[in-house]
Amino acid sequence: MLLALAQWLQNDASFLRVFSYLTFRAVMATITALLIGLVCGPAVIRKLTAMKVGQAVRKDGPQTHLVKSGTPTMGGVLILLGIAVATLLWADLTNRFIWIVMLVTFGFGVIGWVDDYRKVVYKDPRGMSSREKYFWQSVIGLFAAVYLAFSVSEASNVRVYDLFMAWVRSGLSMGLPPHADLMLPFVKSISYPLGVWGFIVLTYLVIVGASNAVNLTDGLDGLVIMPVVLVGASLGVFAYVMGSSVYSKYLLFPHIAGAGELLIFCSAMGGAGLAFLWFNTHPAQMFMGDVGALALGGALGTVAVIVRQEIVLFIMGGIFVAETLSVMLQVTWFKFTKRRFGEGRRLFKMAPLHHHFELSGWKETQVVVRFWIITLMLCLFGLSTLKLR
């Protein structure tokens, strides 16, 4: 919004040309989202407290968590508010990638909001059924996947439509340009051609998988938000590189026209996340709930797909992957041993993984900070793939 205004006025005020610099707008988006979160946070906490949307705590979990019962949840609305305002103010609103990422983020946010609302307002511990939640995630994920399959390699929505129609005329058998290939980290000249169907399936799995993985990780004060900020900031660097014809050529990456604008979105997400952490650090004054976790995970997955860094997201989001695998392994092993031995057995003391460490004697703050450190190391490793190729 401000970019369009600055471009209109810059002939009369040359200093407004600074708005054309992505880095300037990224910094301003971070500051804007951060300030919105810090200013609005207390009001959001009071409102959630008045609505009596307190978090229920599992009685079979760590006993130290019982004091958290009643802490306001659904605080993810504060994050989404900061992201929305900062992105709308500082991003180029003619950019197609901005809108598809916003659609996925807020679409998943609505799903999470409905789930949280049913749990805490209607006192339904199940919230949305797994089938219902997965259905709506699939609708949004598949829509984004189909659109991105034809937009990643094109420079405008007109070209996206032309490519889509060419695919239809080919009997749904046409391949995609090299820009849409699956990129392998640390290898500069090898990529895997996915084709339209392969791209759609992979994109769907990345977006929906990332959303649920972040949601599973959200279980301790401050645990999930800092990894989201770190991974989002790292993806913002990739977006800046891929969106620049100069840097992408120098670093031997495909140039994806318009991807650089996602740096603004990632910066807004980082600022909003840090503001939320101000109130979510131990002892937390509010939790983000599904409305925040599902939305942020979907955002990370969508940005990773656009900048063709699905594998790097898997690396940098290693904490999310480990948490998800711990749940899958725990459930699978329990069901297998129950059928085999008549009694279910557990691989971990409790899943997701962060609860296993708590029950093993780690303090909550130790788990959180150590997971942050691991994520920072993984993000630096992921960023190293920019040059080590």
Curated annotation (Swiss-Prot):
Entries under HAMAP family matching the protein: MraY
Q: What is its EC number?
A: 2.7.8.13
- What InterPro entries does UniProt report for this protein, alphabetically? Glycosyl_transferase_4 (IPR000715), PNAcMuramoyl-5peptid_Trfase (IPR003524), PNAcMuramoyl-5peptid_Trfase_CS (IPR018480)
Kindly state which reaction or reactions the protein catalyses: UDP-N-acetyl-alpha-D-muramoyl-L-alanyl-gamma-D-glutamyl-meso-2,6-diaminopimeloyl-D-alanyl-D-alanine + di-trans,octa-cis-undecaprenyl phosphate = di-trans,octa-cis-undecaprenyl diphospho-N-acetyl-alpha-D-muramoyl-L-alanyl-D-glutamyl-meso-2,6-diaminopimeloyl-D-alanyl-D-alanine + UMP
Protein name per its UniProtKB record: Phospho-N-acetylmuramoyl-pentapeptide-transferase
A single GO BP: peptidoglycan biosynthetic process
The Gene Ontology terms for molecular function here are: metal ion binding; phospho-N-acetylmuramoyl-pentapeptide-transferase activity; UDP-N-acetylmuramoyl-L-alanyl-D-glutamyl-meso-2,6-diaminopimelyl-D-alanyl-D-alanine:undecaprenyl-phosphate transferase activity
Q: What is its membrane topology?
A: Multi-pass membrane protein
State the species of origin: Paraburkholderia xenovorans (strain LB400)
Chief subcellular location equals membrane
Pathway field of the UniProt record reads: Cell wall biogenesis; peptidoglycan biosynthesis
What protein family is recorded?
Answer: Belongs to the glycosyltransferase 4 family. MraY subfamily.
* Chain segments annotated as transmembrane: 25-45, 73-93, 97-117, 135-155, 190-210, 222-242, 259-279, 287-307, 311-331, 366-386
Give the UniProt keywords, A-Z: Cell cycle, Cell division, Cell inner membrane, Cell membrane, Cell shape, Cell wall biogenesis/degradation, Magnesium, Membrane, Metal-binding, Peptidoglycan synthesis, Transferase, Transmembrane, Transmembrane helix
Query: A single GO CC term, please?
Result: plasma membrane
Which cofactors are reported in the record for this sequence? Answer: Mg(2+)
Compartment(s) where it occurs, according to its Swiss-Prot or TrEMBL record? Cell inner membrane
What is the stated purpose of this protein? Catalyzes the initial step of the lipid cycle reactions in the biosynthesis of the cell wall peptidoglycan: transfers peptidoglycan precursor phospho-MurNAc-pentapeptide from UDP-MurNAc-pentapeptide onto the lipid carrier undecaprenyl phosphate, yielding undecaprenyl-pyrophosphoryl-MurNAc-pentapeptide, known as lipid I.
- Name the source's superkingdom: Bacteria
Matching CDD domains: GT_MraY
